[in-house]
Amino acid sequence: MLLILATFEVTGRMVLDQKDSCFTGLLSSEIYENHDSSDLKKLCDDYAKMIYHDYPNRHLAPNQHTDTVNINEHGFRGSEITQTKNENIFRIFLVGGSETYGMFSTSDKTTFQGYLQQKLDTLDTEYEIEVINAGVNAYDSFDSAYQIKTKLIDYDPDLLIVVTGHSVGTPAKEVNIDVPLYYPISNEFAKLKLYYKSPEFFEFTKRVILKNVYGDQGVPGEVIIHKNVEDNVKIWKNTWFEICELGVERNFDVIVAVPPVSGAGNKIPTSWELQNLEKLSHTSIVPSYHLVKDTLRDLDKKCANTVDLTNIFDNETGTIYLDLTHFADAGNMLVAEELFKLSLPFMYEKMGK
C-alpha cells in the first residue's frame, strides 16, 4: 500500500509540473508576460496550498502565509487587523468569491482590496480608511450573505462592497449549519496538501476522466441551464434585499456591484479570450446576464448603491480575462478604480465632509 501511495505521489508531482491548468493557462495566455515562469508556478502552487474549512460554510483557515498570499488570524486575505474598531477608522469590506479574493493576483496588494487600499491611502483625511478582503474562492450569494450575517457584522463595518451576480447560472446552495462529527479530522486531513501533491493530483485525474467520458462541454454540473436562471436571479435579489435591510438596521451601507464577464461587455477579445469564449461557452452566463443587470433597478430601492461593471474593460486591447470570469492584476486595478469612485460619497458622508 505504501508503495502504491508513493508511486501515486511521484506520478502526481511529475504530471502536475507539466499539466497544471493554472500554470499552463497563465503561461499560454501571456497575461503575465513580464513574469518568469517560476513566478507563475509559485503563484499557482500558493493558490493550491490554501486550506479551507467547510463548516458551517466554506471559509479560509486563519494564519496561512506563502510568498504571494497571506491569510490573517481572522481568516481574511491581507494584513492583520483588530476586530474592535477605533472611532477614527472607516472600515470597508469587499465581499465576494474568487475574483474578490484575487485568485490569480500576484500578491495581496494586487487584489481589488489591495489596489483600493492604495488609492484610499492617498486621501487627505483624519480618518484611517481600512479595506478588508473578505472574498473566498467558490462563494455564491448564499455563502456571502451568511458570512455577512454571522461574521462581518461583528467587525463593525461602515461599508460593504459586494461583487456578485455572475454565479446565478447555478442554483445557490443553502448553508448547512450542522457540523458533522468527523469535521475536526477532515480539517487535519486538509493540511496534507501542504506537503503532498496526491490530493491535487486526485482532483486532476478525476477531471481528466470526466472530460474523457462526457467531453469538454458535458461535464456534469458545469453546463448553465439558462431556463433556470430567472428563478435563480429572484433568489439572488431577495438575498441582497435582506442584506441591504440589515445594513440599514446596523448602520452600514451596502453597494452591490455586478462584475465584468468575458463577452458581456464590448471589449474586443484577444485570441486567448476568443478561444475561451468558444471553449467555455457552455459555462457562460452572458446569454442571461441581462436578467442580473436589470435587477439592479430593484436593488437600488433597498441598497445604498448598485453598479454594473460589465463595460469597464471595453477600451482594453490586451488580454484581461484568463477564463470567462477571472482576470489578473491589470483587471483588478481597473475594478478597484471604479470601486474607489463609488465608495467616496459614502465615506465623506460618514466622515462629515
Regions found by a protein language model. Name each.
Residues G165-R297, D314-G318:
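Serine-dependent acyl-ester chemistry module
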Residues C22-K119, L123-D124, E316-T317:
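Membrane/wall-proximal cationic-aromatic binding patches
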Residues I4-S21:
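Membrane-interface motif at the C-terminal end of an N-terminal transmembrane signal
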Residues R91-L94, K119, Y127-Y155, L160-R207:
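Internal alpha/beta domain cores that form substrate/cofactor-binding pockets in large enzymes
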Residues E99-S107, N133-A134, V229-V233, H282, ...:
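Second-shell loop/turn segments in exported
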Residues T7, G12, W236, L296, ...:
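Histidine-centered active-site loop/cap adjacent to the catalytic His
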Residues I89-F90, Y127-I129, Y155-L160, V248-I255, ...:
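Loop/turn elements at helix/coil->beta-strand transitions in domains of secreted/extracellular proteins
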Residues M14-D17, M103-S107, D143-A145, P171-I177, ...:
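Short, solvent-exposed loop/turn and secondary-structure capping segments
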